[in-house]
Every structure is written in C-alpha cells, then in structure tokens.
Amino acid sequence: MSAEMIKIFDTTLRDGEQSPGASMNTEEKIRIAKQLERLGVDVIEAGFAAASPGDFDAISKIASAVSESTICSLARAVEKDIKAAADSLAPAKLKRIHTFIATSPIHMEYKLRMTPSEVIKRAVEAIAYAKSFMEDVEFSCEDAGRSDVGFLKEILAAVIEAGAGTLNIPDTVGYRLPHEMGAIIKELHEFVGNRAILSVHCHNDLGLAVANSLYCIQSGARQVECTVNGLGERAGNAALEEIVMAIKTRRDIFGGLDTRINTKEIYASSQLVANITGIRPQPNKAIVGKNAFAHESGIHQDGVLKHKETYEIMHASDIGLGEQESIVLGKHSGRHAFKDKIKALGFEVSYEELNAAFDRFKALCDQKKEIYDEDIRAILAEETSHIPKVYELVGIQLSDCSMGRPYAAITLKKEGSEEIVDAAIGNGSVDALFKTIDRISQIKGELKDYKVEAVTQGKDALAKVVVKVEFEENKPAIIGHGLHIDTMLATAKAYVGALNSYLSMRELMGKKKCEEERI
C-alpha cells in the first residue's frame, strides 16, 4: 500500500526572512528556491508580493525559475494584496495564493477592530477574489492557537464554500503545547473531513514547534509549514529537516505517512541558507548541527565503530553529509573532474561561473595541500552569488599593530574606471580596513555583526567571513561574504561584497521608483 503524503510547505523565503539579519537579495532567494526544488519541497512560499517592490520582483523571478514546486505568495485579505500576489505569480507553472486574517478575540478586537461576522465576510470575499485568478488558494486563521475552536469551524466552513483548498491553522505566537495543538487539529479534521487539506504552522517560542507539528500530523494535518534550519522571527519556526527526518526515522509511528523530500539534499539546503543569511545552526542543532553526528565519549565512539546503530538512529549519509570528509581533488585535477565534482555537489553553474570557480580552485591548490568538498562548496557559493561587482578588491596592505595604531592601505577597482588607492587608521586592523573602503566609496557603513570561521580543519583552512553592515539608518543590514586563506583579505572581501549588494539594491529601488512615477 502506498504511503499517504504529507505536503511540505517551505516558508524560508517569507517567514524565515523575517528573522533579524536574515534579509536576502533577489538572486540569493532564487538560489535558495532552486535548492528547495531539488530538495523536493511541495510548496515554496516565495514572499509577500504587496510588501515591497523587491518582494514582488523576487517572487516573479522565482516563479519563472522553478517548475517542479508550487510557488506561493502571501497576501492579507484585501484586494490590493491579492492582486499583487496574482500578478507576481503570473510566470509560475504551479501557483498558489495564501491569504489570511486574524481570528483570535484579541486580534479581532484590538488589531482589526472587527466583529467575528465582519471577519468571516472579509475572509470569504478574499477567497472568492483569489479564486478569480487561480484555482489553488490557501486560507490561514492568524493566531488560531488562541482562537475559539467554535469560531474556527464557522470561518473554515465559510471559506471552504468560497473555494479554499488548504486551511492553515497557525500557532502564531508559539503558545500551545503538543497535546493542545493536536486536540485542536483532531477536532477540526473531524469537522472538515475531505473537503480541504488541513495545514499547521507552528512557531518555536516555547521550543515546541517541531513537536507540535508532528503531533498535528498524527491528528490529521496533511500539510506542515516550516523553514530550513528553523529560521524565523523571534525563536524561529518548525525546522523542515527535523520534521522530515522524524517521519522518516520513526516509521513505527508514522508508517503510513511520508514526504516527497529527497533527504540527501537536506545538508546542502541547510548550508546554503546558512551561508546566504549568515545565520548558522548552533553546533548541537538536531540533524544539521556540526555536532549532530559527532561522538566524543570513548564509550560512544567504541560502540559506533563496532555497530553504528548502538548510538546513531540515522546516518549522516541520509542527509547528504559524507561520514568522512574526503579529500576530493588536487592541483593535478583537470576541468572535467572539477565539473563532475560540482555536479555531484548539486550545483548548477554557467560556463563563465565554471571557469571562474576553476581558476579559484587552482589558485587554492597552490596554497593548500588538501582540498575538501567544503572548500569547493564555499568557492561555488561565492562565484554564483551574482552580485554586480561595482567595486573589486585588488589588494590590501596592513601595518603592524604592535607598532602603534594600525592602518590599512587598500586598492579597489571601480567598474568602468581605474584603480583607486587609499589608506586609513583604525582601532584595529578590521576597523582600519572598513574605514579605508568607506573613504574610497564615499559611503559610510556601520558594522552590525562580524563572524569568521574555518571552512575545514587545519592551519591552511580557508577563512569564511560574514559581515552585516548598515549603510543607511533604519534600513536592513546588508550581508557580505568573504573567502580566503588570509582572514584579513577575507574580511575586506566581505565588506566590499556588502557594499556591492547595497549599491545594487539602491540602483534597483531607484529604477522601481522611476517606473512608479511614470505610471
């Protein structure tokens, strides 16, 4: 007998992006969307089309780039939001509008200032309007976790009649315990029957998002909304990888249920989201944390070596992580072998990107004895970022900090111009680097976060630097990435990358403004 499928609705690009510091540009969102498609996600919530021109543009481009997953836009239960969602989804092969309105007493009274009957009327009108654009429409009861179940039944019956095919029950503030959420879903499942698919969207404020989601699946939910790495505002959302691997690992509990997720793509998806957002899972994070398959205890190590199942309930290879990080290529490896390795790692690159990445790889071979998969992933992530290079780092020179206040001299090449050289003194080498780049670009940035980590083990490991920089007050911080064996060079590259992203975003916003003024 074939298993009943649980739909995986990924909202990394919408709810996940609401995590502080996790903002992404359009090209980065497209890369994540294509990886989610490889992962086998059923529905990709690509954004909130009415929120900004940037969100609209990203959804539209993702809709063109992805064909195997349904592309979804969120919309409030108002016509202009729904129209924006429909327009942004026009290029999509498979598309869905996800509209919502709050249903809890506190939200209806204080936020909406509407009566329950007015809320039902608004919801029905929203579904009917969304259905005029496309067949697949989802409805969410915002703050359902604190809503009256009797009222939930009333509004769900009305939106089913209006044409909603999926009914989402969010625990918006992460308030409910598993048995409570399970009881709500069980009662609603018995009421709805096969008239629509029940969905859940659990937040992690009490650390229960995954537990609540799994309990709801057992109680009748057949779609679960989640994010890669549990990314999301406040304490985050239910983690996709934990839900999927729980269903896969506990066949004794979920035996008749399955997902379409290709679990071999879980690790690659986790790493991509972490690299782009700069938010890495904590080391002891289930499934994808770097300690998830590590055994330090001698007793545990002995048991695992004798028989893996003594202390491991799943294999690292199940999520696409090599159990031994193998040395993959060396200085004598050719372009063909490098291309095969890229394909094996799940990357799709253009001819130009392949050449650029291969050149970086050969240069790294001269600096490093052993090249690992993680080195190549890091190089590819940088070379496929598609951020316009308004400024390109040519070189840096740093003074000896022990001789007094350090200074940095930097050479940048501006697009279509000659090289520019300048220098500045700072409170440390990093500060001196950033001040010099600010002087050259004549744009002042304020550093909000700075992280450095080794890509692999060993003294000759590549340094990966992530910076978050605010170039304008009250605007989201821009993320920049830098990769080099020399940490200071990686730092300078990361800051220049953030600057280029900012300039690209500013140009895009300027074009959008001009278009709106013409209209």
Swiss-Prot record:
The cellular location(s) given in this protein's UniProt record come to:
Cytoplasm
Pathway(s) annotated for this protein in UniProt: Amino-acid biosynthesis; L-leucine biosynthesis; L-leucine from 3-methyl-2-oxobutanoate: step 1/4
Q: Keywords in alphabetical order, please.
A: Amino-acid biosynthesis, Branched-chain amino acid biosynthesis, Cytoplasm, Leucine biosynthesis, Manganese, Metal-binding, Transferase
Q: Which cofactor does it need?
A: Mn(2+)
Query: Quaternary state and partners of this protein?
Result: Homodimer.
What EC number is given for this enzyme? Answer: 2.3.3.13
Pyruvate carboxyltransferase domain: which residues? 6-267
Q: Where is this region: Regulatory domain?
A: 392-519
Regarding protein family, the annotation reads: Belongs to the alpha-IPM synthase/homocitrate synthase family. LeuA type 1 subfamily.
The main location class comes to cytoplasm
Q: Which residues bind Mn(2+)?
A: 15, 201, 203, 237
Function field = Catalyzes the condensation of the acetyl group of acetyl-CoA with 3-methyl-2-oxobutanoate (2-ketoisovalerate) to form 3-carboxy-3-hydroxy-4-methylpentanoate (2-isopropylmalate).
Would you say which domain of life the source belongs to? Bacteria
GO biological process annotations for this chain's record? L-leucine biosynthetic process
Spell out the InterPro entries in the cross-references.
2-IPM_HCS-like (IPR050073), 2-isopropylmalate_synth_dimer (IPR013709), AIPM/Hcit_synth_CS (IPR002034), Aldolase_TIM (IPR013785), LeuA/HCS_post-cat (IPR054691), LeuA_allosteric_dom_sf (IPR036230), LeuA_bact_synth (IPR005671), PYR_CT (IPR000891)
Q: Name one Pfam family in it.
A: HMGL-like
Gene Ontology molecular function, alphabetical: 2-isopropylmalate synthase activity; acetyl-CoA C-acetyltransferase activity; manganese ion binding
Reaction it catalyzes: 3-methyl-2-oxobutanoate + acetyl-CoA + H2O = (2S)-2-isopropylmalate + CoA + H(+)
Name this protein carries in UniProt: 2-isopropylmalate synthase
**Originating species:** Wolinella succinogenes (strain ATCC 29543 / DSM 1740 / CCUG 13145 / JCM 31913 / LMG 7466 / NCTC 11488 / FDC 602W) (Vibrio succinogenes)
A cellular component term, taken from the record's GO annotations: cytoplasm
Looking up NCBIfam families in the UniProt record yields: leuA_bact, PRK00915.1-3
